[in-house]
């Protein structure tokens, strides 16, 4: 009987230890941006903006809308993706990005250290998150894009690992004029999750293979969960 109680005690202790380990591994969701500040800067304090290469182009602005039953300020991304002209006659590129990494920063000199080294850039440790989530809708419902994610390696190269087309991660199977929450598992991106640099909305040329495409999408509540 005593041996049985000891075995039960060890089992309960192991389960408690396992539960505690799981609790440490699962990080609380982090809201990267809710777009309510009206600034081209996310809630992490890092830069956000469009990226463009002519002849393609993109711009962002803010709009009032109702998302999931709540009034909210949302991000509008307007794009015009061309399929010819520019480098390699590929039509250039365009999209929107927001930084997850904190950029390098200067350090104020002191009497003791008049020439301090700058603080290095700090990549986000996303290894305890499981997915990227955000709310999205299209202006007409015929829009399309992929999500790009960068770690330190891809950040240095200046490119990203891409998701599948956004419809794969939406309840309706495609963008519509209604708000839907996209849920993109991080394991869709084969990279170093402990050194995340940025996340991007990318309008790829092969999404619109015939003539390119111009349109508008709206985003809200971009998060890591």
Annotate each predicted stretch with a short phrase:
Residues 12-20:
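Bacterial N-terminal signal peptides
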Residues 27-225:
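Beta-rich carbohydrate-recognition modules and glycan-binding surfaces
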Residues 3-5, 19, 42, 58:
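Coiled-coil-like amphipathic alpha-helices with heptad-repeat character
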Residues 21-27:
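Sec/Tat signal peptide C-region and signal peptidase I cleavage site
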Residues 2-12:
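Bacterial N-terminal signal peptides that target proteins for export
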């Amino acid at each position: 009987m005593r041996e049985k109680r000891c075995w039960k005690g060890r089992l309960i202790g192991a389960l408690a230890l396992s539960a505690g380990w799981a609790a440490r591994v699962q990080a609380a969701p982090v809201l990267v941006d809710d777009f309510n500040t009206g600034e081209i800067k996310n809630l992490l304090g890092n830069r956000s903006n469009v990226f463009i290469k002519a002849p393609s182009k993109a711009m962002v602005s803010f709009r009032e809308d109702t998302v999931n039953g709540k009034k909210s300020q949302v991000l509008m991304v307007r794009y015009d993706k061309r399929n010819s002209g520019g480098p390699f006659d590929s039509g250039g590129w365009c999209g929107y990005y927001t930084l997850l990494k904190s950029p390098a920063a200067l350090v104020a000199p002191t009497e003791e250290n008049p020439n301090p080294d700058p603080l290095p850039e700090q990549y986000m440790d996303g290894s305890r998150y499981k997915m990227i989530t955000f709310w999205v809708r299209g202006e007409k419902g015929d829009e399309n894009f992929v999500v790009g994610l960068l770690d330190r390696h891809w950040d240095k190269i200046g490119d990203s690992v891409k998701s599948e087309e956004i419809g794969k991660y939406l309840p309706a199977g495609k963008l519509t004029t209604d708000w839907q929450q996209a849920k993109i598992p991080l394991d869709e991106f084969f990279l170093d999750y402990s050194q995340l640099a940025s996340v991007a909305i990318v309008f790829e040329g092969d999404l619109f293979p015939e003539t390119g495409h111009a349109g508008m999408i709206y985003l809200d509540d971009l998060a890591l969960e």
